Amino acid sequence: MNNTDTKIIKVHGKNIDNFFQNIITNDINNLNTENPLYTAMLSPQGKYLYDFFILKEENFFLLEANANKVNSLIDEIKRYDIRKDISIELQENFYTKVIIKESLVKDY
């Protein structure tokens, strides 16, 4: 993500874990409630479309994506929701903070 202006998307619904496992490049099983994963979506031909961070909460996911591309990312996710089992909400009142652990700062 080159642009530092990001937006947060909340995605929830039936079989949401399996849904994301089938449309992102990273393994959803590596995701937990403590640390986000950096991942991407590709076209069926393998062409890069979007990259974002994904964080799992108890029964939903939060995606942090480039603000300039967030609406088209939402549209792309909706294309894969054939059964209309998921809900996607742009979180207008959410914002991003970066916190770096002291142990990581010492390495730089």
Q: At which residue positions do the language-model features occur?
A:
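Basic, glycine/lysine-rich polyanion-binding surfaces/domains
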Residues: 1-108
